[in-house]
Amino acid sequence: MGDLKGSRKRKAVTRDLDEEPGVVSGDELNLDALDGDLSDKSHDTEHSSDSEIELVDDLSSDDGEEYEDEFDSDEIPSDIESKPIREKSKPDRGVDIFVRGEEVTSDGELGDGYDDDKLNYRVTKDANGNERYIYDEINPDDNSDYSEADENANTIGNIPLSFYDQYPHIGYNINGKKIMRPAMGQALDTLLDSIELPKGFTGLTDPSTGKPLELNQDELELLRKVQMNEITEDGYDPYQPTIEYFTSKLEIMPLNAAPEPKRRFVPSKHEAKRVMKLVKAIREGRILPYKPLTEKAEAEEGVWTYDLWANETPRADHPMHIPAPKLPPPGYEESYHPPPEYLPDEKEKAAWLNTDPEDREREYLPADYDALRKVPGYDSFVKEKFERCLDLYLAPRVRRSKLNIDPESLLPKLPSPEELKPFPSTCATLFRGHSGRVRTLAIDPTGVWLASGGDDGTVRVWELLTGRQIWSVKLSDEEPVNVIRWRPSKDAVVLAAATGDSIHLIVPPILDPEMEKASLDIVDAGWGYAKTLTSDSTKKTSAQWTRPSPSLLDSGVQAVISLGYVAKSLSWHRRGDYFVTVCPGTATPVSLAIAIHTLSKHLTQHPFRRRLKGGGPPQAAHFHPSKPILFVANQRTIRSYDLSRQSLVKILQPGARWISSFDIHPTSSTTSGGDNLIVGSYDRRLLWHDVDLSPRPYKTLRYHQKAIRAVRYHSNYPLFADASDDGSLQIFHGSVTGDLLSNASIVPLKVLRGHKVTGELGVLDLDWHPREAWCVSAGADGTCRLWT
């Protein structure tokens, strides 16, 4: 018996069994093991080739799949074992047909249990006398894919009807007969057909028949559904309830617990290779994104391009045309996600809201958003654009020529600080001993001794190099020592100290006997002259030259000048016979604020009888180093007076709010050909004045954070320095040449920091060494420092 699965013969009419028997394929079926024999009822010796009927099921159908599942068992059902089966080796020609467990005889009659069903075939004899099974034609019902063929249908296939234009027929039907060409309607019939359109009229011609193409009701309904974008299938529900296959039931274990493969999150190297091939082809020009059209292709497509502005001549702008200024580019604060430092806090937001719109710095408040899609509309957009339009057509425009100059070329070429050495850079010696602030200090003309005075009312003399205290004297228990200065001449050593309303002239007992005797003679020479002058003079002065008390006399104090008012400034003349004092107090009378004292005569003079016009009370005064000129500074101006002519020479206007100190260049009018001075102010300014150049400052330096207390020139080196309340000293190089056409050059050199800021006060005074590039500073922290 042949293989059941490989057969594709016609299926016999069968009837389902109550129990589905097991069937095994021919490869697995052992015919020798069967107990039953083939039945031998009739036709035992007839036609061995046709004696066997293969009953085959279509295994590709659904029934076949069910049978495969049912016949997987290795056991042979008892129903089949009980049926007689004919073996191939037996010569019996009789055929017993078993259709799904029912017996069919060779005469075409059903066995037991199959009397009610009708066979779909009949058995006849062929030309050789063998049996022949003739099956009935299949009459398809409505559910069948088979349909009756239209005998009048044209069977020419896809051949165009134009091939039959020369023939009276248009094709052949299924029986091979010619299909004659339909009669053509007259013009009147065509008009009537166009007026009264039949149902299903399309206006088209059926290519297979040549007749007008008409659609039936089903086809019209199909077209309507397609036109209305509806589902063409009848009974289709597009909104069927969703069946949740996985989420409807709670799963304890995962459906698939396999780990994610590496290819899920690693870029594919094969795709990378293919992409690199495409990139290489694009770079080499073998792949073009848009294939350019050739002239021939453009001509075939009928595309012609014309340049509308080929013959257009450019029109010149108006001579007075000025383009509109561009808007400034947006800043960080206009970003939808600005840095945190650009976002205002609650206090800044409240201040912005309380400010008038005209006084606000910007028209908006920076805001932070996570994404650009969350940024709302700008409510002032229309207003901003409207104001921009107003500015464009209402505001006048001015064309300004822009100079293309390198900013660095405008800066002076300053030398390197390394080329300008020597200058002080480090702290060499620290002087400790005062209790309280050290207000003033000075180095003697020999450069060996340092004198200092402070709030404790004492004057101390130190050895400059070692920092050892040599001598001290207490001048007052209540008043501080405001100013202390050495006599500039080297033939005698006299120290002038201003304490309260008195000036003490001191000869420290630290000198050799000859120098000490010469110093005492200079101070004592004026006592007899002062006595004679007082007896002969009719004018009375408030300043009194007196001898000190025995205790002060033993300490080295040789004379005391009582001014009656507190002196804050003291300056010697270059010859050492005159010194000027200034009492800047508001209670000081105008005529007594400035006093010039003569050491050799013990004489005090008040050169100013009237108040200086403008600028407030006087602050400091200095003698010119080579001319009989006195410079007097009040709060806002500096005046120079010729003492020989008793006239005003010049008024300098530094522009500072409150002048604290000033100093005159030591080589003024000798080698430089002009006067130069520096001015320090409480508003943190350091000003350089060239007197011959202008009454205004030549340079203004703003390097300090707090008020400047003192400024000083070096006597031999082109150096000057200033001291500030921020606890620092700044060293500058200032060179002055004799060429009147060249200006002074100023180079910042060094910032010296070491003093502590105490009570909002830092460095109160400074002085230069007469020979070396050293300077000393006095601080509010109670120390003095030597910078070398």
Curated annotation (Swiss-Prot):
One of its GO terms (molecular function) is ribonucleoprotein complex binding. Component of the NOP7 complex, composed of ERB1, NOP7 and YTM1. The complex is held together by ERB1, which interacts with NOP7 via its N-terminal domain and with YTM1 via a high-affinity interaction between the seven-bladed beta-propeller domains of the 2 proteins. The NOP7 complex associates with the 66S pre-ribosome. SMART domains: BOP1NT (SM01035), WD40 (SM00320). One of its GO terms (biological process) is maturation of LSU-rRNA from tricistronic rRNA transcript (SSU-rRNA, 5.8S rRNA, LSU-rRNA). One of its GO terms (cellular component) is preribosome, large subunit precursor. Residues 51-78 have a biased composition (Acidic residues). InterPro entries: BOP1/Erb1, BOP1_N_dom, WD40/YVTN_repeat-like_dom_sf, WD40_repeat_CS, WD40_repeat_dom_sf, WD40_rpt. Component of the NOP7 complex, which is required for maturation of the 25S and 5.8S ribosomal RNAs and formation of the 60S ribosome. PANTHER family: RIBOSOME BIOGENESIS PROTEIN BOP1, RIBOSOME BIOGENESIS PROTEIN BOP1 BLOCK OF PROLIFERATION 1 PROTEIN. WD repeats lie at residues 433-472, 476-516, 613-651, 654-699, 703-742, 758-788. Its main location: nucleus. Keywords: Nucleus, Repeat, Ribosome biogenesis, rRNA processing, WD repeat. Gene3D superfamilies: YVTN repeat-like/Quinoprotein amine dehydrogenase. Residues 38-50, 80-91 have a biased composition (Basic and acidic residues). PROSITE patterns: WD_REPEATS_1 (PS00678), WD_REPEATS_2 (PS50082), WD_REPEATS_REGION (PS50294). This is Ribosome biogenesis protein ERB1.
